[in-house]
């Protein structure tokens, strides 16, 4: 083996569910001496976030095809070809020994460019249902991994890489030992919030009274409206914040979480060891439902499809969970987590890299 450090190009963009797991793997390999660059788009979150982590980023121009008009669809082959050409030029300069596709539109032309240059392609699918880009790229990938069973029939289940501060939380039986008082309910709608959570949970609080205390993350621009909803329900004491910067501390505080079931959220909740009520985002492929199903099947969570997420149903569910029941659910959540997901993905990247 030569003395030159190995080179990895991470292809991921668009949402935190793609970008944060990619960052976890990148940092793990950088600590082992790898050189890492990122392939993304200039108008999505990776453009600002990745450089803050000390990683250089290259941009190509590409966007999704879902929901586009006929004119855009007709132009798609040319746009994909141009993005492939841009990605190919970037990779010829950087000369990665392996590329890691973590999802997002950028992975499509990026993966094809790597394949055309003879560079090994490693794919990681974060969701319980594979995205369109990864479905297509799996046909040319060197290896495919998945966070949850079912996305690909023969791919290894490795979990989702999650933040180290979440992994470092004490086990549920330690963290929750001796807790009493109101049940602590953490409501998380993501950075954009979730209207159904913002509208429903203040009324749930009114039904449950002083048996619960709520920390509600409302999403951008919704804090005042949600605070007013709690006050209007006679429950002004509950905490409402627009964002939560330190999710590990919020998980440590909580007894139960009410949230959407994006892939990274589900994986973090399992790693933290927390019971959950999941409200999957309504999408035609039911991606978030399939993300949450393993935890429900393990007895660690309950799924409410959005039409069933009513004040009565949620209040009755929370009221029916004793502290003993919540601890059992928390332990089950932790038991199905894969805390070494980052190491598993990094190990596969190392294994297939060109020598």
UniProtKB/Swiss-Prot annotation:
Belongs to the glycosyltransferase 28 family. MurG subfamily. The keyword Cell inner membrane applies. It is a peripheral membrane protein. This is UDP-N-acetylglucosamine--N-acetylmuramyl-(pentapeptide) pyrophosphoryl-undecaprenol N-acetylglucosamine transferase. Pathway: Cell wall biogenesis; peptidoglycan biosynthesis. It is an enzyme of class 2 (transferase). Gene3D superfamilies: Glycogen Phosphorylase B (3.40.50.2000). It comes from Salmonella typhi. Cell wall formation. Catalyzes the transfer of a GlcNAc subunit on undecaprenyl-pyrophosphoryl-MurNAc-pentapeptide (lipid intermediate I) to form undecaprenyl-pyrophosphoryl-MurNAc-(pentapeptide)GlcNAc (lipid intermediate II). UDP-N-acetyl-alpha-D-glucosamine binds at residues 15-17, 127, 163, 191, 244, 263-268, 288. The gene is murG. GO terms for biological process: carbohydrate metabolic process; cell division; cell wall organization; lipid glycosylation; peptidoglycan biosynthetic process; regulation of cell shape. One of its GO terms (cellular component) is plasma membrane.
């Amino acid at each position: 083996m030569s003395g030159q450090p190995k080179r990895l190009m991470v292809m991921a963009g668009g949402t935190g569910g793609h970008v944060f797991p990619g960052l976890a793997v990148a940092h793990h390999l950088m600590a082992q001496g790898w050189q890492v660059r990122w392939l993304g788009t200039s108008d999505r979150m990776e453009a600002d976030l990745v450089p803050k982590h000390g990683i250089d980023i290259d941009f190509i121009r590409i966007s999704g095809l879902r929901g586009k008009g006929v004119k855009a669809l007709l132009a798609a082959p040319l746009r994909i070809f141009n993005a492939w050409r841009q990605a190919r030029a970037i990779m010829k300069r950087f000369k990665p020994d392996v590329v890691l596709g973590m999802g997002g539109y950028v992975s499509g032309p990026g993966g094809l460019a790597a394949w055309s240059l003879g560079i090994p392609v490693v794919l990681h699918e974060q969701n319980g249902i594979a995205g369109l880009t990864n479905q297509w790229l799996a046909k040319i990938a060197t290896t495919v991994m998945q966070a949850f069973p079912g996305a690909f029939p023969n791919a290894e289940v490795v979990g989702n890489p999650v933040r180290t501060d979440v992994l470092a939380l004490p086990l549920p039986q330690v963290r929750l030992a001796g807790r009493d008082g109101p049940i602590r309910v953490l409501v998380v709608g993501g950075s954009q919030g979730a209207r159904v959570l913002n509208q429903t949970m203040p009324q749930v609080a009114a039904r449950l009274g002083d048996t619960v205390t709520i920390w509600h993350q409302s999403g951008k621009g919704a804090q005042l409206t949600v605070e007013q909803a709690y006050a209007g329900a006679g429950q002004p004491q509950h905490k409402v914040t627009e964002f939560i910067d330190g999710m590990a501390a919020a998980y440590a505080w909580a007894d139960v979480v009410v949230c959407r079931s994006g892939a990274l959220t589900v994986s973090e909740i399992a790693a933290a060891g927390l019971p959950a009520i999941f409200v999957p985002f309504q999408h035609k492929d039911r991606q978030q439902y399939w993300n949450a199903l393993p935890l429900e099947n393990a007895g660690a969570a309950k799924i409410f499809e959005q039409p069933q997420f009513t004040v009565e149903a949620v209040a009755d569910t929370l009221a029916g969970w004793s502290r003993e029941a919540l601890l059992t659910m928390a332990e089950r959540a932790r038991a199905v987590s894969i805390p070494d997901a980052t190491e598993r993905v990094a190990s596969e990247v190392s294994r297939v890299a060109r020598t």
